[in-house]
Amino acid sequence: MIMRICKGSTHRSDSDSYFNYLLETGVKEYRETTGNHGVYVLRRNVDDHSEFLLLSLWDSVESIKGFAGSDYEKAVFYPEDAKYLVEFDKHVAHFEVLYSSV
């Protein structure tokens, strides 16, 4: 199993709207992609910003490519991301899941 980690930040005032937007875009598309085994959306408020981490679980790199395309280490963005995100990584990280009790 592989965990894909994507991160970005919004203004705290946009945090709830961005979360709902994530559910309608990236999270929905993750869940509709064959080989996806779940998604965690994490949020942490720091001063006037909210940091988001999206952790998605996949059965293989090929499954991730089904979502992200052949250049699967690049972050996937949606049309209104620029409206919300004040900081974001252009690349994501992938980790092999060695153990999970969830």
Name each model feature, range by range.
Residues 12-38, 76-81:
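Short amphipathic alpha-helical segments
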Residues 58, 74-77:
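A short hydrophobic/aromatic micro-motif that marks alpha-helical segments and, especially, helix-coil
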